[in-house]
Amino acid sequence: MRLYLASTSPARLALLRQVGIEPVVVPSHVDEEAAVRLATDSNGELDASAMVTLLARLKAEAILGQRPDGEEIDGVILGGDSAFELGGDIYGKPHEPQIARERWLEQRGKTGTLHSGHWIIEVKNGQAARALGATAHASVEFASDISDSEIDAYVAERVEPEFGRVERDVPAFSCHVNIQPSGASAHSIDHAACQAATAE
């Protein structure tokens, strides 16, 4: 069974490869801001867990019907999204070095929560059969003794501040951030069915 990764995230691709999975990468092209805005208008403010689960689902669903390598998708689609929550504020990925630096300075000496949402869809002959979503949470503690120069080194390496994306040669991250997983909450359509699908 093939796994289709609905993401161009280097971190997610690296994590899958670390456990021996070589997925088919299919970009999803979801307008995340518009999707969150629409959901908020319809259902009220989303918390971080609901937001990453929603975006993970939309990314997975966005590639249904696509034909990577000229063939219908047949296997399992994986969509993912993550967000960092600190002091009641939710942060997405910083797309500019200056924003990344400002966030490091703000987060120094504080503890926040990283929310990671995933959504998988079993696809047979190009049609969705079953789906399952879950959100994991990790407590992220930023040490107070990290220097401005170490933060600058981290930003200069352009390391994506996302769980699983840690460059070994950037001590600003590996030495000054303590990540403690705190379990996962599931948003499921059919747990048993999806587990069976991924085991086939």
Regions found by a protein language model. Name each.
Residues 101-105, 116-139:
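Anionic-ligand binding region
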Residues 1-21, 110, 125, 135-200:
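GST superfamily/GST-like fold recognition
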Residues 82-113:
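Active-site-adjacent loop/tail segments of enzyme domains
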Residues 36-40, 85-86, 128-137, 178-182:
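Acidic/polar active-site rim loop that often engages polyanionic ligands
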Residues 1-76, 149, 153-157, 195-198:
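N-terminal polybasic phosphate/anion-binding patch
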Residues 79:
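Generic enzyme active-site microenvironment
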Residues 56, 100, 189:
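Conserved anionic group-binding/transfer micro-motifs
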Residues 82-85, 114-123, 167:
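Short beta-strand scaffold segments in enzyme catalytic cores
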